[in-house]
Swiss-Prot record:
Coiled coil: none annotated. InterPro entries: ATP_synth_OSCP/delta_N_sf, ATPase_OSCP/d_CS, ATPase_OSCP/dsu. It holds the Pfam family OSCP. Its main location: membrane. This is ATP synthase subunit delta. The keyword Ion transport applies. One of its GO terms (molecular function) is proton-transporting ATP synthase activity, rotational mechanism. The lineage of its organism: Bacteria, Bacillati, Actinomycetota, Actinomycetes, Mycobacteriales. F-type ATPases have 2 components, F(1) - the catalytic core - and F(0) - the membrane proton channel. F(1) has five subunits: alpha(3), beta(3), gamma(1), delta(1), epsilon(1). F(0) has three main subunits: a(1), b(2) and c(10-14). The alpha and beta chains form an alternating ring which encloses part of the gamma chain. F(1) is attached to F(0) by a central stalk formed by the gamma and epsilon chains, while a peripheral stalk is formed by the delta and b chains. F(1)F(0) ATP synthase produces ATP from ADP in the presence of a proton or sodium gradient. F-type ATPases consist of two structural domains, F(1) containing the extramembraneous catalytic core and F(0) containing the membrane proton channel, linked together by a central stalk and a peripheral stalk. During catalysis, ATP synthesis in the catalytic domain of F(1) is coupled via a rotary mechanism of the central stalk subunits to proton translocation. It is found in: Cell membrane. GO terms for cellular component: plasma membrane; proton-transporting ATP synthase complex. The keyword Cytoplasm does not apply. It comes from Corynebacterium diphtheriae (strain ATCC 700971 / NCTC 13129 / Biotype gravis). Keywords: ATP synthesis, Cell membrane, CF(1), Hydrogen ion transport, Ion transport, Membrane, Transport.
Length: 273
């Protein structure tokens, strides 16, 4: 996103968080409903280029853009969702595409807030990461989900069958909205959502690859050690790669710590060459 759009999104996100907080006992339901409706609105905008351009037209006044959004969506979405749309339309976005992307981000955040209200945010974070790893290891399924020639509804139906009864409702809703509405690809988008869930908990993510599965005690000890190193709370996203032979490879942001046996052997070979 360009600077103007980032600033607009930050302001609307703050307004969304405040509105959900003020909903109090209805916050969970309001957040879930708002998230779902924002994705519905994005579907409408994706299918109507003229409308998508008009609601983010910087040549129009803020009130004109807000009035257009109200005229189109009033009575079709809840008052809470309409308020998010009107607030978004009043902002100046760099281009219509980034306005649309901003609504996607807001919808995702609303669903994550609903998980937070249910005490499920950590579980959703883990489920999203696990799903991204499953898709990474199932290239045939991922190819089907990434196929632009296949109808989005059919792809969502396919993924829904895979997820049915295995994840929380929020995880399923977030995963399904990624399909057919990708900003990059399904694996990267779902992994990014898991990191966003971690960030809402005040955690940074350490991606850990080990030769064997780490148990809960080992994960906790590793998280504590990394927290001392980096000075912030950490979420451990771990996966297994037997080819490492032993040890760990840890990635935090752009920094990589390679303590694997295979890595040590490779460095030894390089030194002997």
């Amino acid at each position: 996103m360009h600077a103007a759009s980032r600033e607009a999104l930050a302001r609307v996100t703050s307004d969304l968080d405040k509105a959900l907080w003020e909903a109090k006992e209805n916050a969970i339901a309001t957040a879930a409903h708002t998230g779902a409706e924002l994705f519905d609105v994005v579907e409408v905008l994706d299918g109507d280029r003229a409308l998508r351009v008009a609601v983010a037209d910087s040549a129009k006044s803020a009130e004109d853009r807000a009035g257009l959004v109200s005229a189109v969506f009033a009575g079709k979405v809840s008052p809470a969702t309409l308020e998010v749309l009107v607030t978004s339309a009043r902002e100046l976005w760099s281009n219509p595409r980034e306005f649309r992307d901003g609504l996607v981000t807001l919808g995702r955040r609303a669903l994550l807030r609903s998980a937070e209200g249910q005490g499920q945010l950590g579980q959703v974070e883990d489920e999203l990461f696990r799903l991204s790893r499953i898709l990474d290891k199932e290239p045939e399924l991922t190819l089907l989900l990434d196929d632009r020639s296949t109808d989005g509804a059919k792809k969502r139906e396919l993924l829904a069958k895979v997820l049915y009864g295995k994840v929380t409702a929020v995880t399923e809703a977030l995963a399904l909205q990624v399909i057919g509405r990708r900003e990059s690809n399904a694996i990267d988008d779902i992994d990014a959502l898991s990191k966003e869930a971690a960030a809402l908990q005040g955690h940074s993510v350490a991606h850990v690859v080990s030769a064997g599965r780490l148990n809960d005690e080992q994960n906790q000890a590793l998280a504590q050690k990394l927290e001392r190193i980096y000075g912030r709370a950490m979420s451990i996203h771990s996966e297994v790669d037997p080819s490492l032979l032993g040890g760990l490879v840890i990635r935090v942001g752009d920094e990589v710590i390679d303590g694997s046996t295979s890595g040590k052997l490779e460095r030894l070979r390089a030194n002997l060459a």
